[in-house]
Amino acid sequence: MNQSEILEKVKAIVADQLSVDPEKVVPEASFAEDLNADSLDSVELIMALEEEFGVEIPDEEAEKLKTVQDVLDFINNKVAA
């Protein structure tokens, strides 16, 4: 899976989980500030990402995922490993 495929999947998951327009899901978007995600949204988003990409995102790592780019970097590192 290449980076553009990962980006498209992440955008789709974020847009679906947070009920936002996919056009708003850009790498620099903050989940809390730009996409209005609350803590429950964040938990559900992490679970959806884990399921889609077959990775485990520990709580201490999940807390660091503040933007779409943070998620992309994390997934790219896990998938490339």
Curated annotation (Swiss-Prot):
One of its GO terms (molecular function) is acyl carrier activity. Pfam families: PP-binding. Residues 4-79 form the Carrier domain. Pathway: Lipid metabolism; fatty acid biosynthesis. GO terms for cellular component: cytosol; membrane. GO terms for biological process: lipid A biosynthetic process. Keywords: Cytoplasm, Fatty acid biosynthesis, Fatty acid metabolism, Lipid biosynthesis, Lipid metabolism, Phosphopantetheine, Phosphoprotein. It is found in: Cytoplasm. Transmembrane segments: none annotated. It comes from the Bacteria. InterPro entries: ACP, ACP-like_sf, PP-bd_ACP, Ppantetheine_attach_site. SUPFAM superfamilies: ACP-like (SSF47336). Its main location: cytoplasm. Carrier of the growing fatty acid chain in fatty acid biosynthesis. Belongs to the acyl carrier protein (ACP) family. HAMAP family: Acyl_carrier. This is Acyl carrier protein. It comes from Thermosynechococcus vestitus (strain NIES-2133 / IAM M-273 / BP-1). The gene is acpP.
